């Protein structure tokens, strides 16, 4: 009986049971939506795609930097790879070689605009000294052909071929027409200078003469004639006494 009365009482009514089940279901849905939102935010903040993109761009930039460094190093090595060539601080390239006919003394062949031209000058000197046994920068046939095209060069006159090639390169680098123009300018300027000197001296003499004449004329114009009347010897003596 007590169980039936308790079951029929308000504590176990169907309304109370339905309201309690609804409130528990609502709280479960709220917790589920909260967990879903927090999970979405954490996923967006730490997205693996963003990390992958950052890593990819960082890796790509590092590859570009390494390629740039390798290119600069390769360019420097390419400039320094020529035998017997040295780069000058002002951008030119000098060719040098050791002359075996003169006890291995170092001979400066010349200064060139490009490293290739300096390397070819070295190859020409080396080929003239040792022939096919020389270690060259360019193929031997190219160097031999360049020696054949050279004019006014005698490599078999008894002196060192290196000196002959050096003389040829120095004549090539020497500026032309400056000495002749300077000598002609001095020759042409000498008569003009003498004429200018004579004209200046004549003008100075004329000016001095004109100055003297003007001074004499001014002196003559400034002087006036004073005629004294003869007052006798007594008056003259009195004047002399008064002055003394």
Curated annotation (Swiss-Prot):
GO molecular-function term, one example from the UniProt record: DNA binding
Alphabetical list of InterPro entries matching this protein: AP2/ERF_dom, AP2/ERF_dom_sf, DNA-bd_dom_sf, ERF_plant
Biased composition, class Basic residues, residue ranges: 166-181
Listed GO biological process terms: ethylene-activated signaling pathway; jasmonic acid and ethylene-dependent systemic resistance; response to ethylene; response to jasmonic acid
Main subcellular location of this protein, as a coarse class: nucleus
Pfam families for this protein: AP2
Keywords: Activator, DNA-binding, Ethylene signaling pathway, Nucleus, Transcription, Transcription regulation
Source organism, top-level taxon: Eukaryota
GO cellular component term of the entry, any: nucleus
Disordered: annotated span: 1-22, 166-219
CDD domains in alphabetical order: AP2
Family that this chain belongs to: Belongs to the AP2/ERF transcription factor family. ERF subfamily.
Annotated function: Probably acts as a transcriptional activator. Binds to the GCC-box pathogenesis-related promoter element. May be involved in the regulation of gene expression by stress factors and by components of stress signal transduction pathways. Acts as an essential integrator of the JA and ethylene signal transduction pathways. Activates the expression of the PDF1.2A gene.
Name the UniProt record assigns to this protein: Ethylene-responsive transcription factor ERF094
Lineage: Eukaryota, Viridiplantae, Streptophyta, Embryophyta, Tracheophyta
């Amino acid at each position: 009986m007590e169980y039936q009365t308790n079951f029929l009482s308000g504590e176990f009514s169907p309304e109370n049971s339905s309201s309690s089940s609804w409130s528990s279901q609502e709280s479960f849905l709220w917790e589920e939506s909260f967990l879903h939102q927090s999970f979405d935010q954490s996923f967006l903040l730490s997205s693996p795609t963003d990390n992958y993109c950052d890593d990819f761009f960082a890796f790509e930039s590092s590859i570009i930097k390494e390629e740039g460094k390798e290119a600069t190093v390769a360019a420097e090595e390419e400039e320094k790879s020529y035998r017997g060539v040295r780069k000058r601080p002002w951008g030119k390239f000098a060719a040098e070689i050791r002359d075996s006919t003169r006890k291995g003394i170092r001979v400066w062949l010349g200064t060139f605009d490009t490293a290739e031209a300096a390397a070819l000058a070295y190859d020409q000197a080396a080929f003239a000294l040792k022939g096919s046994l020389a270690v060259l920068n360019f193929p031997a046939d190219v160097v031999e052909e360049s020696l054949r095209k050279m004019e006014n060069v005698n490599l078999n006159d008894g002196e060192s071929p290196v000196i002959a090639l050096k003389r040829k390169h120095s004549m090539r680098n020497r500026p032309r027409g400056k000495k002749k123009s300077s000598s002609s300018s001095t020759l042409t300027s000498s008569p003009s200078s003498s004429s200018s000197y004579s004209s200046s001296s004549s003008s100075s003499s004329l000016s001095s003469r004109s100055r003297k004449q003007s001074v004499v004329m001014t002196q003559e114009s400034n002087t006036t004639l004073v005629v004294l009347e003869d007052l006798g010897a007594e008056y003259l003596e009195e004047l002399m006494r008064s002055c003394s």
